[in-house]
């Protein structure tokens, strides 16, 4: 099992973790229905980029 040779400071730990923050979800408004949905995803009524792609 690996064991560190030297203790890492709080500063080094914080610098390593600086890229771990989560960003908010990117939302778009559908042109046909006006529904808010996640980017690059089909809306609940089956539209994607203004075209009907799923028939329910």
Curated annotation (Swiss-Prot):
One of its GO terms (biological process) is translation. InterPro entries: Ribosomal_bL32 (IPR002677), Ribosomal_bL32_bact (IPR044957), Ribosomal_zn-bd (IPR011332). SUPFAM superfamilies: Zn-binding ribosomal proteins. It comes from the Bacteria. Residues 21-31 have a biased composition (Polar residues). One of its GO terms (cellular component) is cytosolic large ribosomal subunit. Keywords: Ribonucleoprotein, Ribosomal protein. It holds the Pfam family Ribosomal_L32p. The keyword Metal-binding does not apply. Residues 7-16 have a biased composition (Basic residues). The keyword Metal-binding does not apply. Residues 1-36 are annotated as: Disordered. One of its GO terms (molecular function) is structural constituent of ribosome. Belongs to the bacterial ribosomal protein bL32 family. This is Large ribosomal subunit protein bL32. It comes from Shewanella oneidensis (strain ATCC 700550 / JCM 31522 / CIP 106686 / LMG 19005 / NCIMB 14063 / MR-1). The lineage of its organism: Bacteria, Pseudomonadati, Pseudomonadota, Gammaproteobacteria, Alteromonadales.
């Amino acid at each position: 099992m690996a064991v560190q040779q030297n203790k890492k400071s709080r500063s080094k730990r914080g610098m390593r973790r600086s890229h771990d923050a989560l960003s908010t979800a990117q939302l778009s408004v559908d042109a046909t229905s006006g529904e808010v949905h996640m980017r690059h995803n089909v809306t609940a009524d089956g539209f994607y980029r203004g075209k009907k792609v799923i028939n329910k």
